[in-house]
């Protein structure tokens, strides 16, 4: 009886797990080779390996590709999924209001033209029928195209991409930089380099052309309690900004700064009369629906405008994914008509706080020229190893060489064989000061704490051996005495 019961239980579990009308686990299995074909063989980024230009550059992607494609295909990209993310890179993206609610998952630079230039994005993957989505300074003429995974993928060049190592002759103080809005910051980085040290270079004159047109606000289902706080008693409240004098011929973005959200149950907005008028059944269903409302740990803003739609996601402090982000930029890109009106839909009831809601427009006319100025004196004969980067450069003025690799205290640098100070440039990148002349620069990376860790490990092994050996020696000594 026990054996029959056991066998019957196994059969029932198998049916529940693999049955088509049950869990249907079989449907989750894939044939052998599926992972390889999906992540490598049919990866759109394979088109990059067909390029003649195999120097050091990054690419961005406007097509769907597997997570961590740059790592899988040994190319340099702008997207990655990595839990142990470089904290300085996270700080830079936070300053720039990158529209990503978590620190470890980045999917490109969201077509922000100045960032594509500053990060050395030389190429973009895009479907030939979607070139209208390319950032402004990308050429619409593809330099490479291929049939991959049943679809055509093309590679389009950026006409203003900076090289991996470029020089700045002026610096921006941390105080000046921090006082700027996210779009003004990305604009300013084209005029100089942000350094933590002071007095290394002359102060930069910011020449960017970022404007925030005045907008009239209209509320629908939302109450403004003070200058920064808005209360939505029910789901779906709306804040509409109408721009009287729209700005044309620019890259347009919607900027949110200082966002916070406090959840309240829609039941709180209902009067006793409204609840009493409902049937007991409907009242119980409503109470059940909002029973766990207070557990909400994230919220989003839906954006509706005359030039497109968008979405901004925000994780509250009680979320396991909260990472201190309160500023966000949604880039609408460039369009034939200017942004005239945008509606922010508040999906859930509650208190929303915004230090700033604004539309910002950045003129791109001078971006290419400013990038050309930064890249005029750049690192040549670049060699990039596993833990090193080197090259030669000639400068005509006192400059800071900015290298587009994430900063870490593990980096050291020599200039003409002499150790020099590694600077933290633009919050997240490597830098080194150079005097006029021709120089050989070599950066070397060593994991911070590696030597101390190895020494402690060796000491632990010796101590373990001693703990094992001492009793054995004592035992042997006692035997000899006997």
Features from the language model and the residues they span:
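Conserved luminal/periplasmic juxtamembrane motif of membrane-embedded glycan-processing enzymes
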Residues: 1-220, 235-236, 294-310, 315-356, ...
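Active-site-proximal, structured, solvent-exposed surfaces of multi-pass membrane proteins
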Residues: 212-482
């Amino acid at each position: 009886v026990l054996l029959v019961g056991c066998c019957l239980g196994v059969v029932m579990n198998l049916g529940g797990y693999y049955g088509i009308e049950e869990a249907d686990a079989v449907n989750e299995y894939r044939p052998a080779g599926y992972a390889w074909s999906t992540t490598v063989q049919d990866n759109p980024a394979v088109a990059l390996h067909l390029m003649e230009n195999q120097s050091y550059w990054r690419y961005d992607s406007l097509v769907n590709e597997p997570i961590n494609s740059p790592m899988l295909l040994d190319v340099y990209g702008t997207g990655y999924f990595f839990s142990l993310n470089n904290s300085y890179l996270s700080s830079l993206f936070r300053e720039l209001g990158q529209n990503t609610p978590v620190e470890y998952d980045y999917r490109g630079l969201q077509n922000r033209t100045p960032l594509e230039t500053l990060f050395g994005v030389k190429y973009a993957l895009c479907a030939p029928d979607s070139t209208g989505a390319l950032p402004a300074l990308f050429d619409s003429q593809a330099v490479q195209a291929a049939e991959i995974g049943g679809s055509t993928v093309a590679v389009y060049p950026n006409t203003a991409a900076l090289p991996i190592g470029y020089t700045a002759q002026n610096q921006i103080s941390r105080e000046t930089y921090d006082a700027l809005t996210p779009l003004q910051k990305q604009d300013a980085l084209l005029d100089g380099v942000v350094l933590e040290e002071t007095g290394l270079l002359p102060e930069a004159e910011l020449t960017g052309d970022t404007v925030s047109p005045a907008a009239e606000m209209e509320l629908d289902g939302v109450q403004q309690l003070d200058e920064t706080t808005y209360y939505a008693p029910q789901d779906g409240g709306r804040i509409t900004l109408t721009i009287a004098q729209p700005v044309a011929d620019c890259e347009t973005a919607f900027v949110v700064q200082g966002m916070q959200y406090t959840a309240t149950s829609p039941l709180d907005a209902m009067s006793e009369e409204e609840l009493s008028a409902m049937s007991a059944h409907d009242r119980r269903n409503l109470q059940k629906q909002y029973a766990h409302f207070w557990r909400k740990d994230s919220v989003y803003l839906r954006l509706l405008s005359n030039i497109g739609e968008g979405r901004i996601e925000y994780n509250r402090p009680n979320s396991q994914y909260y990472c201190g982000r309160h500023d966000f930029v949604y880039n609408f890109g460039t369009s034939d008509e200017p942004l005239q009106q945008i509606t922010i839909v508040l999906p859930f009831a509650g208190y929303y706080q915004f230090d700033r809601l604004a539309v910002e427009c950045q003129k791109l006319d001078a971006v290419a020229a400013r990038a050309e100025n930064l890249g005029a004196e750049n690192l040549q004969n670049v060699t990039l190893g596993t833990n090193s980067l080197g090259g030669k450069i000639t400068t005509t003025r006192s400059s800071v060489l900015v290298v587009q690799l994430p900063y870490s205290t593990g980096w050291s640098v020599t200039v003409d064989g002499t150790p020099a100070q590694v600077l933290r440039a633009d919050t997240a990148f490597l830098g080194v000061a150079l005097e006029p002349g021709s120089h050989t620069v070599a950066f070397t990376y060593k994991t911070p704490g590696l030597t101390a860790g190895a020494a402690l490990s060796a000491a632990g092994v010796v101590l373990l051996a001693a703990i094992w050996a001492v009793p054995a020696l004592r035992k042997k000594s006692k035997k000899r005495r006997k």
